[in-house]
Amino acid sequence: MFTKYKFLYFLFDSTFFKYWYVIPMAMKIYIEGFDEKGYGVGNNIHVPFAYPGDIVEVKVRRKGKKKIGEIVKIIEESPYRTSNKYCAHLGKCGGCLWGLMDYQYQLEFKKKVIENLFGYDKDIIPSPKTIYYRNRMDYPIYNKVSLKEPGKWYGYIPIKECKMLSKEAEIIINEFNKFIEKYKIPSWDTVKHTGFLRYLVIREGKFTKERMIHIITYKRKKFEELWDFIENIKDLVTSVYWGIREDLGDVSISEKLYHYYGSKFLRERILDIEYYISPNSFFQTNSYQAVNLVKIVKEFLEPSENDVVLDLYSGVGLFSLQIANEVKKVIGIEIVEEAVEMAKLNASINNIDAEFIASPVEKAPIIKANKIIVDPPRAGLTNKAIEYIEKINPDTIVYVSCNPYTQKRDINKLKGYKIIDMQPLDMFPNTPHIENVILMKKSRTTD
């Protein structure tokens, strides 16, 4: 039977689809600048892995109203390019979109983004490490461990190395590829919605040298073969989980978890605080730069013994636990119940008095607080979340964001506050993403 899923697969996989969306003639274009995603732009064509000053020959396809270019040949290289090609997959997988650009120029372009958005001339704090800096990678499985092509949710690049995580992770990736081949385990097909293996998630404690493996699959009663893989990597890991996700969405979070090996949690240490992290919990992905992030948040917040602080989108308590001993009270609000449980555990193991509430920010209780830390996801604050903050009416807001575009949008909506200072950081080297911390104070009526 020719179901709608088979039709979609035919559409995506067929020559018809490729030529219907691809302009058949290659075009030569000059790259003038970047778009918000970090793609090079020239002649209104958006080109991954192209940088200002490049002259490139591209094949063009349409994605909605946008024209996307795929580099066929670099005719003249941008002066911003680097000769340090540190990974075999550079220019193919979407993990390091700016990986072919010199790091100092990456910082300069990120600085320009902040300056154009906010009018602040602030140097970006560089990442202490530019490779092997991430503490988590979520690798989709498509026959082999893979990463995705930029802008293509259905396009996979099989990998044998990844310079974002660690050398040990590269060994694990290759062992998992051998494991897949040995047992002929089918991978999940995001179009047909068939198969089994979905994601290999590797998490690391950069300061504790611990490592957690979280293998996410479609539903199945048993996964006995997994013990064979564990036997081959057990000297490299401290924890292994098998997780099941029955939902058809392409998300690397498990609905059911089975603990197979080692510790139940991954530990990470930021400054003097130890954090326990569960498989589905969020944690800042660059532990080295998280140290600087925490210091900036504390500097902007200026915690004192009379302060009551609300930490919105508090996760496992990264900021709350760092300031708890310096304020009268800190309350974290977090929608993910698993993260709230971890935050409570982290408070306990560090002998810290802090309160955590499982709730969407929009539905959280109104708490009298004079200071707020807010660190929302990339999508930023909803209108209801902004209304909640305005009801609290704090004197000080410290807004931490991994997306300065939505941060700018939200600040424009917040009534009665003005920007006092900001500090951008490079949490994500070799990508166009920017972390930005903004200090806001309540405006006086005479201002």
UniProtKB/Swiss-Prot annotation:
Keywords: 4Fe-4S, Iron, Iron-sulfur, Metal-binding, Methyltransferase, S-adenosyl-L-methionine, Transferase
Stored Gene3D superfamilies: 2.40.50.1070, Nucleic acid-binding proteins (2.40.50.140), Vaccinia Virus protein VP39 (3.40.50.150)
Binding-site residues, [4Fe-4S] cluster: C87, C93, C96, C162
EC number: 2.1.1.-
One GO MF term: 4 iron, 4 sulfur cluster binding
Pfam families: tRNA_U5-meth_tr
Domain of life: Archaea
Family under the similarity heading: Belongs to the class I-like SAM-binding methyltransferase superfamily. RNA M5U methyltransferase family.
Name recorded for this polypeptide: Uncharacterized RNA methyltransferase NEQ053
